[in-house]
């Protein structure tokens, strides 16, 4: 029997960064979560059987949990960073970080000293756990002694559980160097192991980047595949140099035994590896390393495609094995809009979630080392992950055909991923129940702008707010037959009004397209469809919208459309 499906990228449009996913064997579905920064509710849970259609089933963080996580007191682009979703000892577990907390604001908002002490002892790192993906979620369990961001939680085949994350290098060789460390953790108490064994008593540094002057090795994930434990990290920073690297360690009897074997081998070779700090280990020697890199790294990037490529910043990946569709990864990417200047790229939608098929390959020249130190050639060697084999980049459409005797995957790239001709219609006053707020500021409810161009009707009462952050936003409102507007670009602002000259029943709207915000009105009653509205409408006002881009405003988020009553 033959079945064909088509997966379209991005799978989650608009601001859905830092995706992490699992195959939920109990319910035969994929479960995926993304970062939400200062938005509440936060950590949305999406499910899908085959990646063609995603259903939003719940939010992990409600207003009450947001307060316990101190989200009301974070700065712009602070809050919930880079969740990792896993099943650990039968529980659904999310490891995550709260970043950019404003202590003064927290104290003024009623936080106790003990709350802040627990937060800082964990550097904002925490665990949430649940028996059902729909919740309720228990926590936060602040991870005392954690250090850095982007935590991963990994259960090995022997039952040992490892907490792994990235921190600034203690003794950096260059600016921007980070190091990935791991330590075993007790999943019942969520406290670090302290037994004197490798990765037990103190942190163990296992990676600092793939090459010379590598920066921002982060978003680590550990996976067991056959006799190996693989480490994947994003490197280069979440911008135009973003990439994904793969490393591995031979660990047929568990990661703990592999670490013990590394220590013995280092001792036999006379390898003297200086401690990073007292009580910590380092498995990055001059002669040998615990984890060996794929010589074909990076396994995923778009940085080699140049600035003519509209899909940039690709990385921060997470692997998944689907029982029918095989290996896949999910990652973030940014769809850029071309500016007026040479080489100018501008992002308004934020970082979105993309998927790609993954195959496992060996070096066919078996007389060479396979990029993994010692030449293991046994049948238990899975090889290395290859993303979108034969394409070398993300696809915008992936056709998957399953037959009785196998599976065929065909990734395709269109001429451009930069946008659609038909404008999306976002009516912020339609009473949607899926809106979010920023921190605990409930005067405006928002939704993600998921596509450009987008047409947004101006409410007849209340205001339309287009937000990048608290210092870069635009407000439009009706006052009689006039449209009033305010544009805030950091310390600069611009305000005014234009006569709408509308027929009764026709609502002016704002078109967000081609780096501009345009107020459009027609003589028609009602909005009709967005394409007709734009085609037949009169432009009353058109302003440069680049101040709403991430490149101008800074930070890590995308634009949202909001309703202010």
Give the predicted meaning of each segment:
Residues 1-565:
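Carbohydrate-active catalytic/glycan-binding domains of CAZyme proteins
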